[in-house]
Amino acid sequence: MNKSPKVLLFALVVRCIFCAAFVCADDLKPIQLPPPQTEIGKPLMQALKLRQTSRSFDSKPLPRQELSNLLWAGDGINRADSGKRTAPSAMNCQEVDIYVALPEALYLYDPKTHSLVPVVAKDLREATGKQDFVKDAPLTLVYVADWARMKSATEADKQLYSGADVGFIAQNVYLYCASQGLAVVVRGSVDR
């Protein structure tokens, strides 16, 4: 009986924090990314050879074109007629969203418009992980699976499929970074 008020209070506090954050995001405008440059980069076999994890990042911001290319490679639309993506997804649920934590704000990548939609007007990079280097990286990608989009899957399959789908997107990001000489690391050590 005593736990209910605490849970309710916690939920109310969380709701207030998020509402305040969304109000702040209203001041930000969506960012229309330039079209991806699909004719650049190293051949696949060379990118595979160069693929590696790095935990050392230049804090210099990525140019807008580089960010556009990176997000499109990760999970952009590569078949406009069907809306299908560069990364496969189980049953084509496309349940994984990519949040982009930049110094000025947190954005949601919208593959349909190839744009960044503002979510929170705050630098949340440091909050995305426990490692010291996360605050220095020019950006952090956060992959979030929305299981509500996986209506016909069982609970066990939702976990399995979304884990695989995030892996496909992350591998695309790794290969793009290898082809462009960018540092990248997938992290699992995060506050849950």
Regions found by a protein language model. Name each.
Residues F10-A20:
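Bacterial N-terminal signal peptides
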Residues M1-V7:
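N-terminal secretory signal peptides that target proteins for export/translocation
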Residues R51, L70, I98, L139-M150, ...:
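Small-aliphatic-rich amphipathic alpha-helix that forms the alpha element of a beta-alpha
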Residues L8, V23-A25:
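Short linear sequence motif anchored by a di-proline
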Residues A25-A137:
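N-terminal amphipathic, basic helical "cap/leader" segment at the start of enzyme domains
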Residues P5, A80-K84, L182-A183:
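Short secondary-structure capping/junction motifs at helix and strand boundaries
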